[in-house]
Each structure stands twice: as structure tokens, then as C-alpha cells.
Amino acid sequence: MDNREQLRRITELTEQIAGLPKGYLSKKTIGGKVYYYHQWSENGVKQSRYLHDSEIAPLADKIEKRKELQAQLRMLKSQKSRRNEATGMKCTFMHKRTPVAELELDDVTGFIQKIGSVYAPEHLPIGIPVRNEIADRAAFNDWWRDRSIPASRSGVREALESLGVADTKMLLVRCYGLSLSDQYWICPEGAELRWEDINFFQNDFSEDIGDVLFGERKKKDALNFSSPDSTSDGNLKKRWKIIDGKRCLIKGGSNPFRQQPFNEVIASGIMERLGIPHVSYTVIWSKDAPYSVCEDFVTENTELIPAWRLLQAKKQKNSTSRYRHLLECCELLGIGNITPFLDRMLVLDYIIANEDRHFNNFGALRNAETLEWLGMAPIYDSGSSLGYDKMPGQMRSEKDVVCKPFKNHHAEQLKLVTDFDWIDFDRLSDVDELISGVLFCEEAADYIDEGRIHAITESVQRRIGHLQELAMTQTPRQLDTTEDDVREEVAADYAPKMEL
């Protein structure tokens, strides 16, 4: 097989594999009945979905087919050939204006094949070790993969087919890896590109990718891939737009209630009342569906480092809790005031019953050129809360409420709070009006009825009351224990779930 045929076959196999489900089937017995579910990992995050009986056999066949194709692809890649010369793209990994390392990317998969000279190891993403002047390729690929759109996002597979791209990592390559969250990018060999001319903070960007991700018909002309939508994470439908000169993120909600956009506004109102630094949200409507809108809080001089990357600053001991490990990592990196920030975040998440505060949903800000830490970022992304996927009865019982990032249950996370004195409970006296004002609107009635609104209001008021009792009776103390720690960093799965 010559190089051209080999490349054609590799591309074909890669596209076929991308269209098949990952992971494996598992089962568990509840009340004597066996339930099957699909389990897989996405960007290092474990995901799972319960299956109807009719789904089990077809899904098992597809997973087995994926394994067969992966074996063929591995065999093809292992053959001695000049494939790397045919498909490798050499580039310089940049941090704003600073050359950091030489890379070679696979033209088909977007993976990092080789890492050459490292010029500025201090500018590498946190958690990528350098040994004997060589950067760890596996760790670099993990970071690069996390930068791409997750394959689990709603509508992404259809979007890839429409774009003619086999893997979301190839979208990264086509936009030079540029983002509106940080200042990293890649400069292809021989390209005379300057950060000032191509970054999305100071230059306009195409809406083509966002249009396709939102299911809008692909235009007849050639697509412009220069878009920050290629480097946005998360499973919900989202896109970037320039509105009145500001970079704004537009994000949807999940069926059946489409509640997340409204929850962002409610959470913003609660944080405003409590004096918690936060990102402000509003709701807009498009094609009879609600979307939240927020302005980018990162600028051309700063960047967001998610807590997940902060945790990579040092190895976690088995006897150390996730909470304690984060504190130690922040101390090692020189990030101050982490404890007061976590106090406020955990209290907020208890009030709104947030279920998805994973380690990529909060982080720290730093100067991209000097690497000076500026403190923790304002709190953002609080939509998967307020019983967003639950019925009113479930909201009132709260028996199904789980949480992240440190403990599995909010009651245990509250034990990590060191100080309640900053909470002005009088400022929360009108929370019921806040919730009603956001949810009682004509458009929202198609998704959220009056009974649901009352259940949300009652649940929030009950949690505020319990928090007030706790603040008066409990002496806050940090618990350095791994009991009830979150073991898997599982992002919210918005796929329909089978009722148990």
C-alpha cells in the first residue's frame, strides 16, 4: 500500500470510528431488576446513560464494530511507511507572542505526533511535565484533546458530517487552536502569523462554525473556520458572537425544560445579593428556545486556567482529599485567597442545588505574558441547578440531588466552609420574587409551568433557612478527609434518561 492509499484508508477508518459510539455496556441490579447502561469517557471525564431494552443489542454491535475498526487502524499505523511525512504538520506552539515548543500534528486526527524543542517550559500548560528538556507527549495530547469540542455535545456529530471533518480536533487545527479563554495557539511552519492579527479578542471571527453547530444550513460558499466555537467545551449547545463590540457566549438548555439559561440569571441575582464576584447573564430567545448570554470575562491580556489544570500542579496523595489537594496546588502556584472563594462557591451551590460544578467550571485568572496570578475567576456556569432535569416532587424531596467537585452531597460540602459570617441573609429575603420574576414569562410557559416554579422557590427557601440555622449553630471547620469525595470527574449528561 503506497502512502496515498494508506492516507486514504486511515482517513476512511478515522471517519467511520468517529461515527460509532465509544465505551462499553454495563449492568446493575436494582430491586431485583437488571438495568443496562452505556458507559464511556469524554475528555477524561466518565459519562454514562441508561438504556432501553431496544437499544442494548444495536449499541453492542456498534461498539464491537468500533473495536474492530480501531484494531485495523492501529495495524495500519504501525506499518513501516513514510506516513508521517505525508500527514505531519509542523508548527510552533505559542503563548500569545512567546514561542513555547515545536510540535508536529497529524493531519488526519489532529493529535500531537511529535514534540521538538521546548523554548519556554514555564509557558507550557500547567500539568505538562518536561523531563530532560522533552515535554510529555501524552500529557500534551490530553490538554489538546480537552481543548476541542466534546464529541458528546448535542448535535456535534451532525455538525462534523456537515463540515466534512472527521474529528473535532481538526477544527482546532483549522482555527490555529485560538480561544477566547486563553492565549495559546499554533503557528504552522512557514506561516508568517502574528498574534495581533489573528487573535479573537481584537479581531472579528467567522460565525460559520457556530451556525453549523446550531443546526443552521451550511452556506454554499466555502466555510471560514476562523472561529472560537472550535475551542468551546461542554455538552450543551453554545456559540460565540460579537454583540455591540463585546465577545459574548450564547448557550442553550437541555430538554425537556430548557431551564439552564434561566438558572444562570437566578444564580447571578443571588450572587449579586451576596456580594460574590460573578459573571452576569441574561436570557434571549431564538426560534422559540431560550439561551443564556454572558460577556467574556477574559481579555487579550489574561487567561482562565480551569481548576482541573491547577490540580495537575502536583501529584495527589491517596490520603489527601480533593479539597485539600486543590488548596495545596494553589499554594504551590502562588494563588491567594482560595479559601474565601471556595466558601462562597460552595454556599452558592448549596442554595441553588448545583449538580455540575466540576473542575472545569471554575478556575483562576493569570496574566498570559508575565504568568502573574490575578486571583480566582468570577463564578460562572451555574445552570445545571435548581432541579433543572427533575420533576417537582423530586425537587421537594431532594433525594436525587448530587454535587461536585469535592463531595457527592451538599451537606458534606458545606462542612468544608470555613466562615459563614459574610452571608447577609436579609439580602436573600426577596429570592422568591427573583425566581418568579425570571421564570414567570410568557415564552417560558411552554417549558416551565407554575407548579414547577413553586417547587423551585420552595426548595431554595428551604435551603436558605437550613443554611441560616447552620450558620448560627455550627462552628465551621475544614475537614481533611476523603470520605464522600467525588471519585469520578463526570460532567452532566443531558441525554434522555430511563426512568427507574
Sequence positions of predicted segments:
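A positively charged, amphipathic N-terminal helix/segment that binds anionic biomolecules
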Residues: 1-81
